């Protein structure tokens, strides 16, 4: 039987000693949004709760200011 080993999740913001997640950093924010525009949960990304709250707030601010779209797949 083969066992599947998952890579350990870690918080990227803690590793890089980020003090505050900026809503103007679009490249970072897009890594935490699905292709449908939803915010990826921390249980999948491994982000700590403190940074997940900052991340959600930054994404919502960027959406409001039209820096990133609410949804990507308009047809």
Swiss-Prot record:
Entry GO CC: cytosolic small ribosomal subunit
Keyword tags: Ribonucleoprotein, Ribosomal protein, RNA-binding, rRNA-binding
Pfam families the record matches: Ribosomal_S18
GO biological processes: translation
A molecular function (GO) term: small ribosomal subunit rRNA binding
Domain of life: Bacteria
UniProt subunit comment: Part of the 30S ribosomal subunit. Forms a tight heterodimer with protein bS6.
Function of the molecule: Binds as a heterodimer with protein bS6 to the central domain of the 16S rRNA, where it helps stabilize the platform of the 30S subunit.
HAMAP family attached to this UniProt entry: Ribosomal_bS18 (MF_00270)
Family statement: Belongs to the bacterial ribosomal protein bS18 family.
Protein name from the UniProt record: Small ribosomal subunit protein bS18
Source organism of this protein record: Acinetobacter baumannii (strain AB0057)
């Amino acid at each position: 039987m083969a066992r599947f080993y998952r890579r350990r999740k870690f918080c990227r913001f803690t590793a890089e000693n980020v003090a505050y997640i900026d809503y103007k950093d679009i490249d970072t924010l897009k890594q935490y949004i699905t292709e449908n525009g939803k915010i990826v949960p921390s249980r999948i990304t491994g982000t700590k709760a403190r940074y997940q709250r900052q991340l959600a707030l930054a994404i919502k601010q960027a959406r409001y200011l039209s820096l990133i779209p609410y949804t990507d797949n308009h047809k």
